[in-house]
């Protein structure tokens, strides 16, 4: 199926080919100050023929005929031939495309036989699914839909954060003060309380951090008690996450999590050393913990350097080395991301892997993308689609301090506000429930996607749940009204009519 613009370009080539070789015909979009639809520069052809381009355009203007074409006007200006569509013929052709393709209008085969992996959402097990996670989830899901529409085989991968030092902290605190029955009744909120409590106690007694690291090391070594706790944390967390994904109508092609790649970590570290990229060096404790996703201020007296495996990138304009292994052999974020990327390449052979992750990690992605290139993985393109943070009026959300807004609370509030808007409608209870979910959650999605992607957002309940003006519900209402008008007309719409005859 060819769209009208493609057909129009072919028709323009046919019009000009008696006078200009096809290889010399270049079709451009004209600049904004030129009121035309296509512009054809003649400088290159004129130079070959040793002609003045202005004179050449004037000469062609006399020869080119537009009868029985989709074009209504031709203009010679500054070495360009500018062509304008016949508005009636063009509109009729567009609407014929609509009728022929219906909901597939706008799709293409650009991605035929090509695979793209999109890594998005990726919440952490045992932590709340906050409004901050909405951005990655909704942007990533939109990208999946767009690339699928373009003909790509899309693998939407929810790379769950189910590994890392935070699990050691939770295990320690659960054994110290947790209650399984209480947690089973309200998993995420109760696990959050344990996480916050651990950090509150660690401020008073920093040695607790070592207990957390020791528990995680037990997990990495396959300790039965640690493994059983980790499986339980993962199962109850995913059950909570799935309920939110169902509300958002977001589905994934793959949900493996960081832990899936544990048996591949040593291979990627060995490969980095074998290829002469990795060396042993020193890093401050803060730098090591930052590389494991932990941000913590230490006293100066604590800042004794640790031995780590790292990859220096100074020769490539990146002054911060990428840390890939702790001195005790424990893995870091980068270790797991490198192993994951290699596995995705081997299993999927994607042309591109896209990571939908916040802008605060731009440096980190530059680091390990460069490492993948240096290790020889050049056939796959790596892209970081980053976005601004969602902040609270009092500052950045902080899980360890319990300063978060649960996404489920936002979605439920949106549904309730939508119910109020439609309570006087002549609908039964089931219809009201269904419509309020569609409208409420649509409002939240639209409010996020309509923002400037790269700017930080200060969370505002009224803006997030807007039901009027420039909002999701407004667009949904407009669509419903148009469908109603078409149904009530009782006529088949014939787009061969003289549409666009009003030209004033």
PLM features: residue spans?
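Charged, compositionally biased N-terminal leader segments and the immediate start
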Residues: 1-27
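NTP-dependent nucleotidyl-transfer catalytic core
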Residues: 22-44, 52-504
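Short, surface-exposed ligand-recognition loops at beta-strand->loop->(often short) alpha-helix junctions
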Residues: 2-7, 47-53
């Amino acid at each position: 199926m060819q769209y009208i613009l493609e057909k129009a370009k072919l028709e323009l080539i046919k019009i000009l080919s008696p006078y200009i070789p096809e290889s010399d015909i270049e079709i451009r979009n004209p600049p904004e100050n030129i009121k035309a639809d296509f512009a054809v520069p003649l400088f290159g052809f004129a130079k070959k023929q040793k002609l003045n381009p202005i004179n050449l355009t004037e000469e062609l203007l006399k020869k080119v005929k537009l009868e029985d074409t989709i074009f209504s006007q031709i203009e010679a200006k500054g070495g360009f031939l500018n062509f304008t569509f016949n508005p009636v013929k063009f509109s009729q052709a567009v609407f014929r495309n609509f009728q022929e393709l219906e909901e597939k209008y706008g799709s293409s085969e650009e991605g035929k036989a090509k695979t793209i992996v999109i890594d998005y959402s990726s919440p952490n097990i045992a932590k709340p699914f906050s409004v901050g996670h909405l951005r990655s989830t909704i942007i990533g899901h939109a990208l999946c839909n767009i690339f699928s529409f373009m003909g790509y085989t899309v693998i939407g991968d929810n790379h769950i954060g189910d590994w890392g030092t935070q699990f050691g902290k939770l295990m320690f605190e659960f054994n110290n003060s947790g209650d399984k029955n209480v947690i089973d009744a309200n998993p995420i909120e109760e696990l959050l309380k344990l996480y916050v409590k651990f950090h509150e106690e660690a401020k008073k007694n920093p040695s607790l951090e070592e207990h957390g690291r020791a528990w995680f090391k037990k997990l990495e070594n396959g300790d039965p008690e640690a493994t059983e706790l980790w499986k339980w944390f993962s199962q109850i967390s995913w059950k909570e996450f799935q309920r939110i994904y169902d509300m958002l109508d977001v589905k994934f092609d793959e949900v493996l999590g960081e832990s899936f790649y544990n048996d591949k970590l040593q291979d990627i570290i060995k490969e980095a050393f074998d290829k002469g990229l990795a060396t042993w060096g020193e890093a401050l404790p803060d730098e090591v913990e930052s590389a494991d996703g932990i941000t913590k201020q230490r006293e100066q007296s604590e800042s004794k350097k640790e031995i780590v495996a790292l990859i220096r990138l100074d020769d490539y304009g990146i002054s911060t080395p990428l840390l890939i292994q702790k001195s005790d052999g424990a893995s870091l974020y980068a270790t797991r991301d490198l192993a994951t990327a290699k596995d995705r390449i081997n299993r999927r052979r994607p042309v591109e892997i896209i990571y939908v992750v916040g802008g605060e990690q731009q440096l980190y992605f530059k680091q390990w993308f460069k490492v993948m290139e240096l290790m020889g993985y050049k056939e796959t393109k790596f892209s970081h689609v980053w976005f601004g943070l969602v902040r609270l009026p009092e500052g950045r959300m902080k899980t360890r301090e319990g300063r978060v807004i649960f996404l489920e609370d936002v979605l439920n509030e949106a549904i309730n506000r939508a119910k109020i808007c439609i309570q006087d409608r002549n609908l039964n209870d089931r219809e009201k429930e269904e419509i309020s979910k569609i409208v409420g959650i649509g409002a939240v999605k639209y409010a996020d996607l309509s923002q400037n992607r790269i700017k930080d957002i200060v969370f505002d309940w009224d803006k997030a749940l807007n039901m009027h003006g420039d909002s999701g519900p407004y667009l949904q209402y407009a669509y419903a009204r148009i469908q109603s008008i078409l149904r009530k007309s009782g006529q088949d719409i014939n787009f061969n009519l003289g549409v666009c005859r009003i030209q004033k």
